[in-house]
Amino acid sequence: NFKPGTMSKYGLDYATLSQVNGRLIYVTCKGFLPGPYEHRTALDEVVQMMGGLAYMTGRPGDPLRAGTSVNDIMGGMFGAIGALGALVQRGITGKGQEIASALFENNVFLVGQHMLQYAITGKPASPMPDRISAWAVYDVFTVKDGEQIFLAAVSDAQWSTFCHLLGFADLLADPRYATNNERVEQRKTLMPVLRDRLSKLSAAHLSAEFEKAGLPFAPIRKPEELFDDEHLNATGALADITLPDGEHAGETARATLQIGRASCRERVYHPV
């Protein structure tokens, strides 16, 4: 991490290096693109707070950073995508270029859907915990033994399947819940009933039934529980790596390093 101007100070900026190699593709990841903010120190929290993401993530009056460093991660991804485009263009023009990715602009891209909503409708988006869902059944439920699971029924057909699957014939026949729009309007009466009934069922049972029926579901998992995820282990998405240094040097850890269909266990090295 360098302050703005550091690379120029050492003669390692694009303007200097491109004079040595005109085919150079130079990726720089910044806090802010050139403009009034470019001198500021950027952190993921900084751009999440000023870029609307923390506002949308937390409850009203309680802005909250996302549960991972989304801008650090995606800023690097945007830089890599830009480099790939520059490689294609260099194949046509024979010339390199500088690619700039920035945390703040990346964050604004992430909240772009909410900005567009306001631009089109004039209605500002509410924070996600306070939003009015487009579907009535689209929530996290606390079930047997205190476990939690996300369940959804996002169409009238899925609502019918949901009710048949769980034996909720009375809810399916209730005219108040006939269509999705009506279910959304009646959410304050419907959700307490669903929460009470679902609390008697286990997350494992609901997962199995929803999977067989093709309904959306997701048990709530902690990051450390993903090491035992059967899908991740079957696809090779988790790779064993040997730590090169530090107090745990030589030890093996598992990381999410799969690229495409090739597992990191099958490494392919290409010349630089």
Annotated model-derived regions:
Residues T6-A153:
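Active-site-adjacent "lid/gating" segments in soluble enzymes
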Residues T28, L103, A173-T179, P219, ...:
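Structural signal for conserved beta-strand scaffold positions within catalytic alpha/beta enzyme cores
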Residues G35, T179, L226-F227:
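Short secondary-structure capping/turn micro-motifs that flank functional sites
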Residues M128-S133, D139-V140, E185, E247-R254:
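Short Gly/Pro-enriched turn/cap motifs at secondary-structure boundaries
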Residues V137-A213, F217, R265:
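Aromatic-enriched alpha-helical interface/lid elements that frame and gate functional surfaces
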Residues K212-S263:
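A glycine-rich dinucleotide-binding beta-alpha-beta segment and adjacent secondary-structure elements
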Residues A262, E266-V272:
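Single conserved hydrophobic/aromatic residue that forms the stacking wall/gate
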